[in-house]
Amino acid sequence: MDLQGIKIGSKKGYSTGYRLLSLAIAFVITAVLLFALQPEAEGSPVAIWPYVEKEAQEAGLDPHFVYAIAFAESSLDPFADSGRARGVMQLKKVAWQTVTELPYAYAWDWQTNIKVGIAYLNFCKQILIKDRTFSYPMLAAAYRYGPTAVKNKGYNLANIDRPSNKIYRQILSGKTGYIQGVQYPILTASYVN
């Protein structure tokens, strides 16, 4: 058989062309597998989870809660843009400016966005603690609607409009730990209630 000048399967055994073709195919397959199996591609769920876990713990927040908020807000898309909010944590400009002096353009950097999102969660948490109304469902409502809106509803979750987002509905109903619909990068027993 002649494949563009490379003889394959000659009577004397494999030709040099066939060996080179086999090596090239093996090299391409190896390169593709190595690229596909990179565990921490920038902004991937596998990279985002350890970052959220570290930053949330340092800030005194439940990492599973923060990860679920990020997933609910953007499906972990670093370039998510609702027209009003940006990045993984879907931060609005006013929320961003409440907790940082960094330019809002930095909201496109997924690590900065998560860090500022956690700072805003802590800002909301401190308001709720001061008003003796802190709970993770209330914190989710304050993050989604703003702490003033939650206060105006008497800190009563029953008075707050239920979002269409299934993840937020679970969180606002008091579910913690593993949240159905959140795609965790590695599912372990610690995620399950």
Question: What is each of the regions a protein language model found here?
Answer:
Residues 52, 56, 69-97, 146-148:
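Cell-wall polysaccharide-cleaving catalytic domain and substrate-binding groove, primarily
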Residues 26-76, 111-114, 122, 126-129, ...:
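Export/targeting segments at the very N-terminus of extracytoplasmic proteins
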Residues 1-5:
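N-terminal intrinsically disordered, acidic low-complexity segments at the extreme N-terminus
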Residues 93-152:
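Alpha-helical segment that forms one wall of the substrate-binding/catalytic cleft
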Residues 134-193:
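Catalytic and substrate-binding regions of cell-wall glycan-acting enzymes that process beta-1,4-linked
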Residues 65-66, 87, 135, 139:
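Residue-level detector of well-ordered alpha-helical segments, enriched
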Residues 58-62, 82, 133-135:
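Extracellular/periplasmic catalytic domains that process cell-envelope and extracellular macromolecules
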Residues 7-27:
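N-terminal Sec-pathway targeting helices
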